[in-house]
Amino acid sequence: STVCADYLVSELGVSPNSVLKETSSYDTIGNAYFSLTIHAAPLGWSEVCTVTSAFHMPRARACFDWIYGACASAPRVAYLPVADEGMTEAALEARRRREEESAAALRRSAEEVGADLAAISGWLHSTHRCYAVNRQHEWGEPTEATKEELETY
């Protein structure tokens, strides 16, 4: 979010006083959870916009729909996909496959955990590799991602 904030301010001329950063997340599900709990819900926002690459948008949308859908006071979420540029066709296909697999896993988790923000918080902080203290020893270990998939990050 720091790079995005810099871009908004330096390239688009947005006032720094109009930009809020979310720096607690390590991934998309964290973006959804922390943007809601740190900014959107406490500040009573009426709308947020999720901007990401087209290949990533289906999973991003699933994350934001699940998390924001679990909060009665959550704002409406708009989605703005941007073009998939800057990678080979093979890398893009590898990433699309990875995104589909990750989206399927997310849907299974959402079904299991349900649409309750407290339950989602419990799940996120007890089972998710990025946020569960009982899994922090796994940081730095190889992921299941292939070399082609990793090149797209």
Q: Where do the PLM segments sit?
A:
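A structural signal for short, hydrophobic/glycine-enriched beta-strand patches
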Residues: 1-105
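A structured, mid-to-C-terminal "fold-capping" secondary-structure block
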Residues: 85-153
